Amino acid sequence: EIKESITTHCLNAAEKIRAESLTAKTITISIRTSPFQNKEVYYSNSKTIDFPIATNNSIEIVKAALTGLNSIFKKNYRYQKSGIVLSGLSDSENNQNLLSTTKDNKIKKLMKSIDYTNHKYGRSTLSLADAGINKKWNIKKEYSSKIDTADFYFLPIIKAS
């Protein structure tokens, strides 16, 4: 499940930076167990990996993340949280790869097609197999607030008297 969550985080982050025409030079992967479980040992770790060339390719980002995850993952722990951070962001138009190939252009077209399909038919319509299908690890929607607090106009107004 931890592998699925890291993969899903990577796919979402890669899609977002492509939408902003950005590339990332570095990825940081983090995992942890619950600090509140008294019966279990707390474990937290992270790994930072630099890409040879800044990228927004989902496949490269997931591959690097899973390599990092394998280096910090310990068996027999109940992980509660995982995350990734893409950093060293730069404009993808300014990233000049002198070794750019036909393969790179095909990957760009593939990523664009995946983003288009997911935008049209819903997130994760097209995904990598490592992201899983059931996503048992995902946040339970029944525990989420029904109020959209991401929109400023839906926030409650409090008046002090």
Where are the model-predicted features located?
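Basic, low-complexity intrinsically disordered segments
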Residues: E1-S161
